[in-house]
Curated annotation (Swiss-Prot):
Protein name stated in the entry: Temporin-1LT
Subcellular location: Secreted
Superkingdom of the source species: Eukaryota
Residues bearing the modification Leucine amide: 13
GO cellular component, one term: extracellular region
Keyword Secreted recorded: yes
């Protein structure tokens, strides 16, 4: 899983 996607998910949550 890419850190960029994780950052986006964290931003949404």
């Amino acid at each position: 899983f890419f850190p960029i996607l994780g950052k986006l998910l964290s931003g949404i949550l």
